[in-house]
């Protein structure tokens, strides 16, 4: 079981690394966010692998801290991804800046915890468990988990909103990412008190990372291709207008421009 679990995490790390590399070679802000997101997720996977397989209180404590830090920044990247992917969160600059400021402070406190143990202490390591005792009276212990869960709930609500308000061409992609995030969140909640090294939420979040890459930069609905080809073949002499998944006009041919006297199309 221990070997199989480690092999699963290692495979996910490799796949996320491949996703990051492929996203790096694509253009656009969304591709850049996906590249950074996949890279940080792959790094988090490596740290988690070291956490469960390399013995030693100090190195295990450091890797636990780094894993928690990675989750802070992954959530920020996921919010930016959601912004560019769905068009939401454009008007919440102050909130995003506050999230970055909190994550920076939280990162410093978690690194310092390796020596001062003010947030958590690892008391025992064996083949099946890493016993972690959190200082539940510490502000940053409470703030870290409240912050993480609130952001995940916000992201889930945002994807629910997009599923309800998008065409069937795009809602399928939102649904897949929503389901993966929801499963990871539920597994995280269910196992929050578990000291087992077999954290079932980690593979779920890893799968979500790969789904994000695929449905953002690779997936094109067959129905969209068929309908687009049909439109071009049958209605070449008609006015054509195309919208993206946010409902914004991304293309308008000359015939439609002349019909409506359009001189500028915002892309």
Where are these predicted regions, by residue range?
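Conserved small/polar residues in nucleotide/adenosyl-binding loops
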Residues: 265-267
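Sensory modules in modular signal-transduction proteins
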Residues: 222-256
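Structural signal for the C-terminal ends of transmembrane alpha-helices
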Residues: 18-26, 83-87, 159-167, 215-219
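PAS-family sensory domains
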Residues: 260-261
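Alpha-helical transmembrane segments of multi-pass integral membrane proteins
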Residues: 23-47, 95-101, 136-193
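Interfacial "cap-and-anchor" motif at the non-cytosolic start of specific transmembrane alpha-helices
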Residues: 2, 161-231
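Extracellular-loop-to-transmembrane junctions of the mid-late helices
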Residues: 1-11, 110-158, 189-201
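Individual alpha-helical transmembrane segments in multi-pass integral membrane proteins
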Residues: 1-13, 28-114, 145-149, 199-206
């Amino acid at each position: 079981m221990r070997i199989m679990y480690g092999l699963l995490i290692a495979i996910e790390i490799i796949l996320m690394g491949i996703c990051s590399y492929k996203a790096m070679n694509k253009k656009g802000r969304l591709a850049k966010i996906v590249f950074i997101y996949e890279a940080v997720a792959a790094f988090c996977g490596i740290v988690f692998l070291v956490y469960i397989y390399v013995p030693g209180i100090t190195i295990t404590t450091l890797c636990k801290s780094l894993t928690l830090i990675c989750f802070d920044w992954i959530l920020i990247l996921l919010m930016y991804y959601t912004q560019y992917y769905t068009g939401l969160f454009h008007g919440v600059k102050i909130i995003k800046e506050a999230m970055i400021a909190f994550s920076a402070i939280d990162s410093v406190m978690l690194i310092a915890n390796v020596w001062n143990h003010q947030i958590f202490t690892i008391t025992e390591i064996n083949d099946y468990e890493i016993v972690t005792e959190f200082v539940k009276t510490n502000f940053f212990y409470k703030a870290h988990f409240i912050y993480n869960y609130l952001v995940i709930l916000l992201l889930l609500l945002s994807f629910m909103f997009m599923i309800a308000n998008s065409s069937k061409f795009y809602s399928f992609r939102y649904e897949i990412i929503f389901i993966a995030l929801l499963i990871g969140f539920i597994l995280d909640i269910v196992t929050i008190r578990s000291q087992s090294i077999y954290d079932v939420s980690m593979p779920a979040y890893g799968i979500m990372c790969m789904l994000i890459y695929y449905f953002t930069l690779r997936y094109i609905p067959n129905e969209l291709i068929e309908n687009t080809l049909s439109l071009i073949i049958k209605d070449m002499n008609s006015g054509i207008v195309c919208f993206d998944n946010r409902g914004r006009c991304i293309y308008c041919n000359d015939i439609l421009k002349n019909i409506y006297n359009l001189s500028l199309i915002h892309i």
